[in-house]
Amino acid sequence: MANKEELIEFEGVVTETLPNTMFRVRLENGHEVIAHISGKMRKHYIRILTGDSVKVEMTPYDLTKGRITYRAR
């Protein structure tokens, strides 16, 4: 598992909701990634809808997948 220092964080917008709490997110640099919700967001029932601004953590080893860690209000 990647250390906290190795994670890359991006801002993005949810463009599509996929099954099993997965989302397609368009990052600020134009790339699209598939992201899932972090455990704490799942635990606290934070809802994510299409069009929401989110923060996505990604590992440098696989830049096509990420984890949504924050939803902007």
Swiss-Prot record:
Domain called S1-like: residue spans: 1-73
InterPro entries: NA-bd_OB-fold, RNA-binding_domain_S1_IF1, S1_domain, TIF_IF1
Cell compartments where the protein resides: Cytoplasm
Stated name of the protein: Translation initiation factor IF-1
Task of the protein: One of the essential components for the initiation of protein synthesis. Stabilizes the binding of IF-2 and IF-3 on the 30S subunit to which N-formylmethionyl-tRNA(fMet) subsequently binds. Helps modulate mRNA selection, yielding the 30S pre-initiation complex (PIC). Upon addition of the 50S ribosomal subunit IF-1, IF-2 and IF-3 are released leaving the mature 70S translation initiation complex.
Primary localisation category: cytoplasm
Gene: infA
A GO cellular-component term linked to this record: cytosol
Molecular function (Gene Ontology), one example: ribosome binding
Family listed: Belongs to the IF-1 family.
Key words of the record: Cytoplasm, Initiation factor, Protein biosynthesis, RNA-binding, rRNA-binding
Domain of life: Bacteria
Assembly and binders: Component of the 30S ribosomal translation pre-initiation complex which assembles on the 30S ribosome in the order IF-2 and IF-3, IF-1 and N-formylmethionyl-tRNA(fMet); mRNA recruitment can occur at any time during PIC assembly.
